[in-house]
Regions:
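Active-site neighborhood of phospho(di)ester-bond hydrolases with catalytic His/Asp-centered motifs
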Residues: 40-41, 62-69, 88-91, 139-142, ...
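Active-site HxH/HxHxD metal-binding segment of metal-dependent hydrolases
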Residues: 45-129, 213
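Hydrophobic residues at beta-strand termini and immediately following loops
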Residues: 18, 122, 140
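A generic "binding-loop/recognition-motif" signal
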Residues: 23, 46, 70, 94, ...
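Conserved beta-strand hairpin/beta-sheet module of binuclear metal-dependent hydrolase folds
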Residues: 6-57, 149-159
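Metallo-beta-lactamase
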Residues: 104-105, 127, 134-214
Length: 214
């Protein structure tokens, strides 16, 4: 297990990263030390290390957020909910893709069909509260038709939209190259340069560093 703290743990906010699934997906656990409220982002498979950390720190998982429908970002969601609770959340535009094994690629890639309903759907501009921290939902189609990111002022959970030095694939079901470039340019690169980007795979970066590539 590898862990990271968001900007060394500013105030009472903490961030841990766990690698999950056959695709080595970054699964993030964001939590507030005072309230113990937590949000898990993109749990692509079961993770006993994540579960142990949540229980040892007595965290209360409020949301299990899925940035998009691909199996390596969703396959552990129901398992985590069964063990620690929390609402499974996804953008409304991605709800149907979550249930479609041909779009979420679960059967063709992993050999295991994954299909389920979310507990809650959100729309662009909606906000999720963890402790005193507010996360804004940003609709970023392109990698999938209903992809999204979460932004709270100094960090961005980018899913598979924006990576260190590149962007998400656009050769998969419902993906579109023009859409992802437009979303990055008009919705993400407008954020402050010092915004830390935590992607679905690979290392972190900043908006300022990625702006130079576009």
């Amino acid at each position: 297990m590898k862990t990271e703290k968001s900007q060394e743990g500013i105030d009472n906010r903490m961030l841990e990263k766990f690698y999950v699934s056959m695709m080595n997906t970054n699964c993030y656990l964001y939590y507030d030390e005072d309230s113990k409220e937590a949000m898990v982002i993109d749990i692509g498979d079961t993770s006993e290390q994540l579960l142990e950390f949540i229980k040892e720190n007595e965290l209360k998982v409020k949301y299990i957020y899925l940035t998009h429908c691909h199996f390596d970002h969703i396959s552990g969601a129901e398992w985590l909910k069964e063990n620690v609770g929390g609402e499974i959340v996804i953008l409304e535009a991605e709800k149907e893709n979550l249930k479609d094994i041909n779009v979420n690629l679960s059967e063709i890639v992993s050999g295991k069909s994954v299909s389920f309903e979310p507990d809650k759907v959100v729309f662009e501009g909606d906000e999720l509260l963890i402790g005193n921290d507010t996360f804004k939902v940003i609709y970023t189609p392109g990698h999938t038709a209903g992809g999204s990111c979460l932004y709270n002022g100094d960090i961005l959970f980018a899913g598979d939209t924006l990576f260190l030095g590149t962007h998400g694939r656009t050769d998969l079901p419902t993906s579109n190259y023009s859409d992802i470039i437009r979303a990055i340019k008009t919705k993400l690169l407008t954020l402050p340069d010092d915004t830390i980007v935590y992607p679905g795979h690979g290392g972190s970066t900043t908006i300022g560093a990625e702006r130079e590539l576009y």
